[in-house]
Protein backbone atom coordinates (compact mmCIF):
# COMPACT_ATOMS: atom_id res chain seq x y z
CA UNK A 1 0.00 0.00 0.00
CA UNK A 2 1.43 3.37 -1.02
CA UNK A 3 1.94 6.25 1.36
CA UNK A 4 -0.24 9.33 1.63
CA UNK A 5 0.15 12.81 0.24
CA UNK A 6 -0.39 15.82 2.48
CA UNK A 7 -3.75 16.26 0.79
CA UNK A 8 -4.76 12.68 1.64
CA UNK A 9 -3.81 13.23 5.27
CA UNK A 10 -5.78 16.46 5.56
CA UNK A 11 -8.78 15.07 3.72
CA UNK A 12 -8.93 12.02 5.99
CA UNK A 13 -8.83 14.27 9.07
CA UNK A 14 -11.91 16.16 7.94
CA UNK A 15 -14.26 13.47 6.59
CA UNK A 16 -17.43 13.21 8.69
CA UNK A 17 -19.30 10.70 6.54
CA UNK A 18 -19.46 9.33 3.01
CA UNK A 19 -17.49 6.98 0.77
CA UNK A 20 -14.51 7.93 -1.37
CA UNK A 21 -15.58 8.52 -4.96
CA UNK A 22 -18.91 9.89 -3.78
CA UNK A 23 -19.78 13.20 -2.10
CA UNK A 24 -18.36 13.25 1.42
CA UNK A 25 -19.36 15.57 4.24
CA UNK A 26 -16.30 17.56 5.29
CA UNK A 27 -15.73 19.62 8.44
CA UNK A 28 -14.67 23.23 7.85
CA UNK A 29 -12.04 24.69 10.20
CA UNK A 30 -12.04 28.23 8.84
CA UNK A 31 -14.63 30.12 6.80
CA UNK A 32 -13.59 33.45 5.28
CA UNK A 33 -16.25 35.83 3.98
CA UNK A 34 -16.40 39.16 2.15
CA UNK A 35 -19.11 41.55 1.03
CA UNK A 36 -19.89 40.12 -2.43
CA UNK A 37 -20.79 36.45 -1.92
CA UNK A 38 -22.17 36.57 1.63
CA UNK A 39 -25.33 38.79 1.64
CA UNK A 40 -27.64 36.23 0.02
CA UNK A 41 -26.27 33.49 2.28
CA UNK A 42 -27.02 35.53 5.40
CA UNK A 43 -30.51 36.25 4.12
CA UNK A 44 -31.03 32.54 3.55
CA UNK A 45 -30.19 31.95 7.21
CA UNK A 46 -32.73 34.56 8.30
CA UNK A 47 -35.43 33.13 6.05
CA UNK A 48 -34.88 29.67 7.55
CA UNK A 49 -34.62 30.94 11.12
CA UNK A 50 -31.06 29.66 11.47
CA UNK A 51 -27.91 31.05 13.06
CA UNK A 52 -24.25 30.78 12.11
CA UNK A 53 -23.19 27.53 13.76
CA UNK A 54 -19.59 28.55 14.51
CA UNK A 55 -19.13 32.31 14.26
CA UNK A 56 -15.77 31.86 15.99
CA UNK A 57 -14.54 29.86 12.96
CA UNK A 58 -15.74 32.54 10.55
CA UNK A 59 -13.96 35.78 9.66
CA UNK A 60 -15.10 38.66 7.49
CA UNK A 61 -13.39 41.53 5.72
CA UNK A 62 -14.22 44.15 3.11
CA UNK A 63 -12.22 43.96 -0.11
CA UNK A 64 -13.88 43.65 -3.54
CA UNK A 65 -15.93 46.86 -3.54
CA UNK A 66 -13.64 49.00 -1.41
CA UNK A 67 -12.56 52.35 -2.90
CA UNK A 68 -8.81 52.85 -2.61
CA UNK A 69 -9.14 56.66 -2.69
CA UNK A 70 -11.62 58.30 -0.30
CA UNK A 71 -12.40 54.88 1.10
CA UNK A 72 -15.76 55.80 2.61
CA UNK A 73 -17.07 57.44 -0.57
CA UNK A 74 -18.91 54.43 -2.03
CA UNK A 75 -21.04 55.78 -4.86
CA UNK A 76 -22.06 52.60 -6.69
CA UNK A 77 -25.47 51.55 -5.36
CA UNK A 78 -24.82 47.80 -5.49
CA UNK A 79 -21.37 48.11 -3.94
CA UNK A 80 -22.72 50.22 -1.09
CA UNK A 81 -25.56 47.78 -0.49
CA UNK A 82 -23.13 44.86 -0.30
CA UNK A 83 -20.78 46.74 2.02
CA UNK A 84 -23.62 47.82 4.29
CA UNK A 85 -25.02 44.29 4.33
CA UNK A 86 -21.74 42.76 5.50
CA UNK A 87 -21.36 45.46 8.17
CA UNK A 88 -24.81 44.61 9.54
CA UNK A 89 -24.46 40.85 9.18
CA UNK A 90 -21.18 40.43 11.03
CA UNK A 91 -22.66 42.32 13.98
CA UNK A 92 -26.01 40.50 13.93
CA UNK A 93 -24.39 37.07 13.72
CA UNK A 94 -21.47 37.93 16.04
CA UNK A 95 -18.77 37.16 13.49
CA UNK A 96 -15.15 38.30 14.00
CA UNK A 97 -14.21 40.77 11.28
CA UNK A 98 -11.95 43.57 10.13
CA UNK A 99 -14.07 46.70 9.82
CA UNK A 100 -13.82 48.80 6.70
CA UNK A 101 -10.87 51.13 7.28
CA UNK A 102 -9.66 49.26 10.36
CA UNK A 103 -6.06 48.33 11.11
CA UNK A 104 -6.45 44.75 9.81
CA UNK A 105 -8.71 45.38 6.82
CA UNK A 106 -7.57 44.12 3.45
CA UNK A 107 -7.99 41.43 0.83
CA UNK A 108 -9.35 38.31 2.51
CA UNK A 109 -6.58 36.04 1.20
CA UNK A 110 -3.99 38.32 2.75
CA UNK A 111 -5.71 39.07 6.04
CA UNK A 112 -6.18 35.36 6.82
CA UNK A 113 -2.46 34.52 6.79
CA UNK A 114 -1.46 37.86 8.35
CA UNK A 115 -3.66 37.24 11.39
CA UNK A 116 -2.54 33.62 11.70
CA UNK A 117 -5.99 32.18 11.07
CA UNK A 118 -4.60 30.29 8.08
CA UNK A 119 -2.58 27.37 9.45
CA UNK A 120 -1.23 23.99 8.32
CA UNK A 121 -3.78 21.22 8.51
CA UNK A 122 -6.84 23.44 8.24
CA UNK A 123 -9.78 22.92 5.89
CA UNK A 124 -10.58 26.43 4.61
CA UNK A 125 -13.36 27.74 2.39
CA UNK A 126 -14.41 31.16 1.12
CA UNK A 127 -16.87 32.45 -1.43
CA UNK A 128 -13.97 33.40 -3.68
CA UNK A 129 -12.17 31.36 -6.34
CA UNK A 130 -8.67 32.32 -5.18
CA UNK A 131 -9.01 30.60 -1.80
CA UNK A 132 -6.36 28.14 -2.99
CA UNK A 133 -3.90 30.82 -1.82
CA UNK A 134 -4.08 29.37 1.70
CA UNK A 135 -2.76 26.03 0.45
CA UNK A 136 0.73 27.54 0.60
CA UNK A 137 0.57 26.89 4.36
CA UNK A 138 -0.20 23.19 4.05
CA UNK A 139 -3.95 23.72 4.26
CA UNK A 140 -6.83 22.67 2.04
CA UNK A 141 -8.36 25.86 0.69
CA UNK A 142 -10.89 26.34 -2.09
CA UNK A 143 -13.62 28.66 -3.30
CA UNK A 144 -17.32 27.95 -2.89
CA UNK A 145 -20.59 29.40 -4.20
CA UNK A 146 -23.10 31.44 -2.24
CA UNK A 147 -25.41 28.45 -1.63
CA UNK A 148 -22.44 26.60 -0.14
CA UNK A 149 -21.55 29.67 1.93
CA UNK A 150 -25.00 29.43 3.51
CA UNK A 151 -24.54 25.68 4.09
CA UNK A 152 -21.23 26.30 5.88
CA UNK A 153 -22.79 29.08 7.96
CA UNK A 154 -25.54 26.72 9.10
CA UNK A 155 -23.58 23.48 9.58
CA UNK A 156 -19.82 24.21 9.55
CA UNK A 157 -19.62 21.46 6.92
CA UNK A 158 -19.58 21.09 3.15
CA UNK A 159 -20.19 18.22 0.73
CA UNK A 160 -17.26 17.52 -1.59
CA UNK A 161 -16.02 14.76 -3.89
CA UNK A 162 -12.34 14.06 -3.34
CA UNK A 163 -10.37 15.18 -6.41
CA UNK A 164 -7.56 13.34 -8.15
CA UNK A 165 -3.99 14.42 -7.39
CA UNK A 166 -1.63 16.32 -9.66
CA UNK A 167 2.00 16.77 -8.60
CA UNK A 168 3.88 19.75 -10.03
CA UNK A 169 7.61 19.77 -9.36
CA UNK A 170 9.46 23.06 -9.84
CA UNK A 171 13.22 22.48 -9.99
CA UNK A 172 16.34 24.54 -10.58
CA UNK A 173 17.45 28.06 -9.76
CA UNK A 174 15.78 30.96 -11.59
CA UNK A 175 17.61 33.64 -13.49
CA UNK A 176 17.75 37.12 -12.00
CA UNK A 177 14.45 38.84 -12.76
CA UNK A 178 12.38 35.63 -12.80
CA UNK A 179 9.93 35.21 -9.93
CA UNK A 180 7.28 32.80 -8.67
CA UNK A 181 4.64 34.63 -10.75
CA UNK A 182 6.65 33.61 -13.81
CA UNK A 183 6.72 29.97 -12.63
CA UNK A 184 2.95 29.72 -12.51
CA UNK A 185 2.35 31.74 -15.69
CA UNK A 186 4.86 29.55 -17.54
CA UNK A 187 3.16 26.39 -16.27
CA UNK A 188 -0.26 27.60 -17.44
CA UNK A 189 1.10 28.79 -20.80
CA UNK A 190 2.67 25.38 -21.43
CA UNK A 191 -0.17 23.12 -20.32
CA UNK A 192 -3.32 25.23 -20.69
CA UNK A 193 -6.23 26.33 -18.54
CA UNK A 194 -7.72 22.81 -18.26
CA UNK A 195 -4.62 21.09 -16.85
CA UNK A 196 -5.93 20.89 -13.29
CA UNK A 197 -9.64 20.25 -13.87
CA UNK A 198 -10.70 17.54 -11.42
CA UNK A 199 -7.38 17.65 -9.55
CA UNK A 200 -5.88 19.09 -6.43
CA UNK A 201 -2.38 20.26 -7.32
CA UNK A 202 0.54 19.79 -4.95
CA UNK A 203 3.66 21.88 -5.59
CA UNK A 204 7.06 20.54 -4.58
CA UNK A 205 10.72 20.80 -5.57
CA UNK A 206 13.85 22.68 -4.63
CA UNK A 207 12.57 25.77 -6.45
CA UNK A 208 9.50 25.77 -4.18
CA UNK A 209 11.58 25.16 -1.06
CA UNK A 210 13.67 28.24 -1.91
CA UNK A 211 10.64 30.54 -2.06
CA UNK A 212 9.40 32.72 0.78
CA UNK A 213 5.88 32.15 2.10
CA UNK A 214 4.67 35.20 0.20
CA UNK A 215 6.11 33.87 -3.06
CA UNK A 216 4.51 30.49 -2.41
CA UNK A 217 1.13 32.14 -1.94
CA UNK A 218 1.43 33.64 -5.43
CA UNK A 219 1.72 30.17 -6.95
CA UNK A 220 -1.12 28.59 -4.97
CA UNK A 221 -3.30 31.64 -5.66
CA UNK A 222 -3.29 30.93 -9.39
CA UNK A 223 -4.06 27.20 -9.18
CA UNK A 224 -7.64 27.95 -10.20
CA UNK A 225 -6.37 29.58 -13.40
CA UNK A 226 -5.56 26.15 -14.83
CA UNK A 227 -8.70 24.53 -13.50
CA UNK A 228 -7.60 23.24 -10.11
CA UNK A 229 -9.65 24.80 -7.34
CA UNK A 230 -7.18 23.56 -4.71
CA UNK A 231 -3.40 24.06 -4.57
CA UNK A 232 -1.25 22.87 -1.69
CA UNK A 233 2.35 22.84 -0.47
CA UNK A 234 4.08 20.99 2.34
CA UNK A 235 4.67 23.15 5.43
CA UNK A 236 8.26 23.64 6.54
CA UNK A 237 10.31 25.85 8.86
CA UNK A 238 9.55 28.92 6.73
CA UNK A 239 5.85 28.25 7.31
CA UNK A 240 6.29 27.98 11.06
CA UNK A 241 8.52 31.07 11.23
CA UNK A 242 5.95 33.09 9.28
CA UNK A 243 3.14 32.10 11.65
CA UNK A 244 5.04 32.48 14.90
CA UNK A 245 3.68 35.32 17.04
CA UNK A 246 0.71 35.90 14.74
CA UNK A 247 -2.41 36.91 16.69
CA UNK A 248 -4.53 33.82 16.06
CA UNK A 249 -2.07 30.94 16.17
CA UNK A 250 -2.50 28.29 18.90
CA UNK A 251 -1.39 29.39 22.35
CA UNK A 252 0.82 26.31 22.65
CA UNK A 253 2.62 27.06 19.40
CA UNK A 254 5.34 24.43 19.74
CA UNK A 255 2.80 21.65 20.23
CA UNK A 256 1.01 22.86 17.12
CA UNK A 257 4.26 22.87 15.16
CA UNK A 258 4.98 19.30 16.24
CA UNK A 259 1.66 18.26 14.71
CA UNK A 260 2.15 20.39 11.59
CA UNK A 261 5.49 18.67 10.94
CA UNK A 262 3.62 15.39 10.42
CA UNK A 263 1.52 16.95 7.67
CA UNK A 264 3.87 16.31 4.77
CA UNK A 265 3.62 13.94 1.85
CA UNK A 266 5.13 10.49 2.24
CA UNK A 267 7.92 9.65 -0.21
CA UNK A 268 5.85 6.83 -1.71
CA UNK A 269 2.62 8.83 -2.02
CA UNK A 270 0.64 8.11 -5.19
CA UNK A 271 -0.28 10.80 -7.73
CA UNK A 272 -2.53 10.53 -10.76
CA UNK A 273 -0.41 12.88 -12.84
CA UNK A 274 3.12 14.29 -12.42
CA UNK A 275 4.66 17.31 -14.18
CA UNK A 276 8.13 18.80 -13.80
CA UNK A 277 9.26 22.29 -14.81
CA UNK A 278 12.86 23.53 -14.67
CA UNK A 279 12.65 27.18 -13.60
CA UNK A 280 16.26 27.85 -14.62
CA UNK A 281 15.01 27.76 -18.21
CA UNK A 282 12.27 30.33 -17.65
CA UNK A 283 12.17 33.98 -18.68
CA UNK A 284 9.86 36.72 -17.41
CA UNK A 285 6.32 36.05 -18.64
CA UNK A 286 3.73 38.38 -20.17
CA UNK A 287 0.23 37.44 -21.32
CA UNK A 288 -1.00 38.63 -24.71
CA UNK A 289 -4.58 37.29 -24.76
CA UNK A 290 -7.71 36.87 -22.68
CA UNK A 291 -6.93 33.94 -20.42
CA UNK A 292 -3.79 33.20 -18.39
CA UNK A 293 -2.61 30.45 -20.76
CA UNK A 294 -2.20 33.02 -23.53
CA UNK A 295 1.25 34.04 -22.38
CA UNK A 296 4.81 34.04 -23.69
CA UNK A 297 8.31 34.41 -22.35
CA UNK A 298 9.65 37.91 -22.85
CA UNK A 299 11.16 38.22 -26.33
CA UNK A 300 9.08 35.38 -27.73
CA UNK A 301 6.69 36.20 -30.58
CA UNK A 302 2.96 35.89 -30.02
CA UNK A 303 1.74 32.60 -31.56
CA UNK A 304 -0.18 31.96 -34.76
CA UNK A 305 -3.96 31.78 -34.60
CA UNK A 306 -4.93 28.16 -33.87
CA UNK A 307 -8.67 28.46 -33.29
CA UNK A 308 -11.55 30.89 -32.84
CA UNK A 309 -10.57 31.54 -29.22
CA UNK A 310 -7.20 32.87 -30.38
CA UNK A 311 -8.83 35.00 -33.08
CA UNK A 312 -11.28 36.48 -30.62
CA UNK A 313 -8.48 37.17 -28.13
CA UNK A 314 -6.32 38.92 -30.74
CA UNK A 315 -9.30 40.99 -31.90
CA UNK A 316 -10.21 42.01 -28.36
CA UNK A 317 -6.62 42.83 -27.37
CA UNK A 318 -5.93 44.60 -30.68
CA UNK A 319 -2.77 42.52 -31.06
CA UNK A 320 -1.46 40.32 -33.89
CA UNK A 321 0.52 37.07 -34.19
CA UNK A 322 4.24 37.70 -34.54
CA UNK A 323 4.24 40.76 -32.31
CA UNK A 324 6.10 40.70 -28.99
CA UNK A 325 5.45 42.15 -25.55
CA UNK A 326 7.65 45.11 -26.48
CA UNK A 327 5.04 46.15 -29.07
CA UNK A 328 2.33 46.71 -26.45
CA UNK A 329 1.59 50.39 -25.84
CA UNK A 330 0.78 50.60 -22.15
CA UNK A 331 -1.53 53.21 -20.66
CA UNK A 332 -1.85 51.74 -17.15
CA UNK A 333 0.20 49.75 -14.66
CA UNK A 334 -1.40 48.06 -11.66
CA UNK A 335 0.63 46.72 -8.73
CA UNK A 336 -1.79 44.92 -6.43
CA UNK A 337 -4.30 42.03 -5.96
CA UNK A 338 -4.31 38.91 -3.78
CA UNK A 339 -1.66 37.51 -6.13
CA UNK A 340 1.03 40.15 -5.75
CA UNK A 341 0.25 42.90 -3.22
CA UNK A 342 2.36 41.70 -0.32
CA UNK A 343 5.32 43.53 1.19
CA UNK A 344 7.88 41.42 -0.67
CA UNK A 345 6.13 42.19 -3.98
CA UNK A 346 6.28 45.93 -3.29
CA UNK A 347 9.95 45.67 -2.31
CA UNK A 348 10.77 43.93 -5.60
CA UNK A 349 8.87 46.52 -7.62
CA UNK A 350 10.56 49.39 -5.78
CA UNK A 351 13.99 48.10 -6.85
CA UNK A 352 13.11 48.88 -10.47
CA UNK A 353 11.47 52.22 -9.67
CA UNK A 354 13.78 53.96 -7.20
CA UNK A 355 15.28 57.16 -8.57
CA UNK A 356 13.27 56.97 -11.81
CA UNK A 357 9.93 58.31 -13.06
CA UNK A 358 7.03 56.71 -14.87
CA UNK A 359 6.64 57.28 -18.60
CA UNK A 360 4.59 60.23 -19.89
CA UNK A 361 0.88 59.63 -20.48
CA UNK A 362 0.88 56.55 -18.24
CA UNK A 363 -1.07 55.98 -15.03
CA UNK A 364 0.54 53.70 -12.45
CA UNK A 365 -1.06 52.74 -9.16
CA UNK A 366 0.17 50.74 -6.19
CA UNK A 367 -2.48 49.16 -3.97
CA UNK A 368 -1.10 47.30 -0.93
CA UNK A 369 -3.23 44.26 -0.24
CA UNK A 370 -3.88 45.06 3.40
CA UNK A 371 -3.55 47.82 5.96
CA UNK A 372 -0.62 46.04 7.71
CA UNK A 373 1.23 45.77 4.39
CA UNK A 374 0.62 49.46 3.66
CA UNK A 375 1.89 50.46 7.09
CA UNK A 376 4.95 48.19 6.86
CA UNK A 377 5.78 49.58 3.41
CA UNK A 378 5.46 53.17 4.63
CA UNK A 379 7.65 52.40 7.61
CA UNK A 380 10.55 51.53 5.31
CA UNK A 381 9.86 54.33 2.84
CA UNK A 382 8.44 52.39 -0.10
CA UNK A 383 5.55 54.83 -0.43
CA UNK A 384 7.98 57.69 -0.99
CA UNK A 385 9.87 55.71 -3.65
CA UNK A 386 6.67 55.09 -5.58
CA UNK A 387 5.26 58.59 -5.10
CA UNK A 388 8.52 60.24 -6.17
CA UNK A 389 8.43 58.07 -9.29
CA UNK A 390 4.93 59.28 -10.18
CA UNK A 391 2.92 56.29 -8.96
CA UNK A 392 -0.32 56.69 -7.01
CA UNK A 393 -0.12 55.18 -3.52
CA UNK A 394 -3.54 53.85 -2.56
CA UNK A 395 -5.39 52.33 0.39
CA UNK A 396 -5.86 48.53 0.48
CA UNK A 397 -8.46 46.56 -1.45
CA UNK A 398 -8.95 44.34 -4.49
CA UNK A 399 -8.83 47.49 -6.61
CA UNK A 400 -8.07 47.17 -10.32
CA UNK A 401 -7.97 43.38 -10.28
CA UNK A 402 -11.68 43.46 -11.16
CA UNK A 403 -14.20 46.06 -12.22
CA UNK A 404 -16.29 46.04 -9.03
CA UNK A 405 -14.98 49.27 -7.51
CA UNK A 406 -13.96 52.72 -8.79
CA UNK A 407 -10.52 51.50 -9.96
CA UNK A 408 -10.99 50.62 -13.63
CA UNK A 409 -8.83 50.66 -16.74
CA UNK A 410 -10.42 52.90 -19.40
CA UNK A 411 -11.81 51.24 -22.51
CA UNK A 412 -9.16 50.41 -25.09
CA UNK A 413 -6.22 50.92 -22.73
CA UNK A 414 -3.56 48.25 -22.18
CA UNK A 415 -2.61 47.56 -18.55
CA UNK A 416 0.40 45.72 -17.16
CA UNK A 417 -1.12 44.01 -14.13
CA UNK A 418 0.20 41.87 -11.28
CA UNK A 419 -3.25 40.31 -10.81
CA UNK A 420 -4.40 36.82 -11.77
CA UNK A 421 -6.97 37.17 -14.56
CA UNK A 422 -6.88 38.80 -17.98
CA UNK A 423 -10.43 38.01 -19.10
CA UNK A 424 -12.38 40.32 -21.38
CA UNK A 425 -13.65 43.35 -19.43
CA UNK A 426 -12.08 42.07 -16.19
CA UNK A 427 -10.48 45.42 -15.32
CA UNK A 428 -13.25 47.48 -16.88
CA UNK A 429 -15.29 47.44 -20.07
CA UNK A 430 -12.90 47.13 -23.01
CA UNK A 431 -9.81 47.03 -20.77
CA UNK A 432 -6.87 45.02 -22.11
CA UNK A 433 -4.99 43.20 -19.35
CA UNK A 434 -1.44 41.82 -19.53
CA UNK A 435 -0.47 39.67 -16.55
CA UNK A 436 3.10 39.80 -15.31
CA UNK A 437 5.28 39.87 -12.20
CA UNK A 438 5.70 42.96 -9.98
CA UNK A 439 9.19 43.42 -11.40
CA UNK A 440 7.96 43.44 -14.99
CA UNK A 441 5.07 45.76 -14.14
CA UNK A 442 7.31 48.23 -12.32
CA UNK A 443 9.89 48.30 -15.10
CA UNK A 444 7.13 48.71 -17.68
CA UNK A 445 5.78 51.73 -15.82
CA UNK A 446 9.13 53.46 -16.16
CA UNK A 447 9.67 52.53 -19.81
CA UNK A 448 6.06 52.86 -20.95
CA UNK A 449 6.30 49.38 -22.44
CA UNK A 450 7.46 45.95 -21.39
CA UNK A 451 11.22 45.55 -21.13
CA UNK A 452 13.46 42.71 -19.99
CA UNK A 453 14.04 43.08 -16.25
CA UNK A 454 16.90 40.60 -16.47
CA UNK A 455 18.92 43.35 -18.14
CA UNK A 456 18.13 46.03 -15.56
CA UNK A 457 20.06 46.98 -12.42
CA UNK A 458 18.24 46.67 -9.10
CA UNK A 459 18.39 49.56 -6.65
CA UNK A 460 18.96 48.89 -2.96
CA UNK A 461 15.73 49.57 -1.07
From Swiss-Prot:
Top-rank taxon: Bacteria
Keywords assigned: 4Fe-4S, Amino-acid biosynthesis, Branched-chain amino acid biosynthesis, Iron, Iron-sulfur, Leucine biosynthesis, Lyase, Metal-binding
Cofactor: [4Fe-4S] cluster
Pathway: Amino-acid biosynthesis; L-leucine biosynthesis; L-leucine from 3-methyl-2-oxobutanoate: step 2/4
UniProt cross-references to Gene3D superfamilies, sorted A to Z: Aconitase, domain 3 (3.30.499.10)
The enzyme's E.C. designation: 4.2.1.33
Known catalytic reactions: (2R,3S)-3-isopropylmalate = (2S)-2-isopropylmalate
InterPro entries according to UniProt: 3-IsopropMal_deHydase_lsu, Acnase/IPM_dHydase_lsu_aba_1/3, Acoase/IPM_deHydtase_lsu_aba, Aconitase_4Fe-4S_BS, Aconitase_4Fe-4S_dom, IPM_dehydratase_rel_enz, IPMI_cat
Group of enzyme by EC: lyase
Example GO molecular function: 4 iron, 4 sulfur cluster binding
GO terms classed as biological process: L-leucine biosynthetic process
Cofactor, free-text remark: Binds 1 [4Fe-4S] cluster per subunit.
Protein family (similarity comment): Belongs to the aconitase/IPM isomerase family. LeuC type 1 subfamily.
HAMAP family named in the record: LeuC_type1 (MF_01026)
Main function: Catalyzes the isomerization between 2-isopropylmalate and 3-isopropylmalate, via the formation of 2-isopropylmaleate.
Subunit organization: Heterodimer of LeuC and LeuD.
Protein name: 3-isopropylmalate dehydratase large subunit
Organism: Streptococcus mutans serotype c (strain ATCC 700610 / UA159)
Lineage: Bacteria, Bacillati, Bacillota, Bacilli, Lactobacillales
